[in-house]
């Protein structure tokens, strides 16, 4: 079976090796690492072309980066060619979440709507703080930062690609 780019979810980039045993140093976002460290089957891509499909042997953290060790590769020279590759997983392999929980990739790109203000724009990014995630929405109101808390999220509709908010007064600067 040939994998299409749309079948894959890119979770990071190999930025180097670590040690002599073939560990790969991965750069990605805070939202990517927990999922990437759980996935067993990985796909390495360079310029959209598959370089290697393999199983994850081990994953761990080191100085803000994820270290991956892949099955069958125990030497730094054997994995050197993967530096610069994107690390992806098949979307179908991503485990489901309990009702009401979503992966970042399901939310990014959604149309953000507030019950009172109407369309806010597009949910373009998500970042993590000590307290909770923050949704970055860009649109007619400029950049709006919305705390990802249940009190503000009225509904998430994956089928219509829309997230409905019930934002408090003052969170969005109205002109």
From Swiss-Prot:
Domain PRC barrel: 99-171
Subcellular compartments: Cytoplasm
Pfam families according to UniProt: PRC_RimM, RimM
A Gene Ontology cellular-component term: cytoplasm
InterPro entries registered for this protein in UniProt: PRC_barrel-like_sf, PRC_RimM, RimM, RimM_N, RimM_N_sf, Transl_B-barrel_sf
Keyword rRNA processing belongs to the record: yes
TM stretches of this protein: none
Protein's GO biological process: ribosomal small subunit biogenesis; rRNA processing
Gene3D superfamilies membership: PRC-barrel domain, RimM
Family: Belongs to the RimM family.
Record-linked NCBIfam families: 16S_RimM (TIGR02273)
Its job: An accessory protein needed during the final step in the assembly of 30S ribosomal subunit, possibly for assembly of the head region. Essential for efficient processing of 16S rRNA. May be needed both before and after RbfA during the maturation of 16S rRNA. It has affinity for free ribosomal 30S subunits but not for 70S ribosomes.
HAMAP family for this protein: Ribosome_mat_RimM
Subunit structure, as described in the record: Binds ribosomal protein uS19.
Domain remark in the UniProt entry: The PRC barrel domain binds ribosomal protein uS19.
Protein name: Ribosome maturation factor RimM
Organism expressing this protein natively: Syntrophotalea carbinolica (strain DSM 2380 / NBRC 103641 / GraBd1)
Organism lineage: Bacteria, Pseudomonadati, Thermodesulfobacteriota, Desulfuromonadia, Desulfuromonadales
């Amino acid at each position: 079976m040939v994998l299409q780019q749309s079948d894959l979810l890119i979770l990071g980039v190999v930025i180097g090796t670590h040690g002599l045993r073939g560990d790969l140093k991965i750069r990605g976002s805070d939202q990517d690492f927990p999922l990437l460290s759980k996935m067993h089957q990985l796909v390495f891509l360079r310029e959209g072309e598959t370089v290697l499909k393999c199983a994850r042997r081990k994953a761990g953290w080191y100085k803000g980066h994820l270290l991956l060790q892949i099955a069958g590769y125990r030497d730094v020279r054997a994995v050197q060619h993967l530096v610069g590759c994107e690390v992806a997983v098949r979307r179908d392999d991503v485990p489901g979440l309990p009702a009401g929980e979503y992966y970042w990739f399901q939310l990014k790109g959604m149309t953000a709507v507030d019950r009172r203000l109407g369309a806010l724009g597009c949910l373009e990014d998500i970042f993590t703080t000590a307290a909770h995630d923050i949704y970055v929405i860009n649109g007619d109101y400029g950049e709006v930062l919305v705390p990802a808390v249940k009190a503000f999220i009225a509904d998430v509709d994956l089928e219509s690609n829309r997230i409905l908010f019930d934002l408090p007064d003052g969170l969005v600067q109205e002109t």
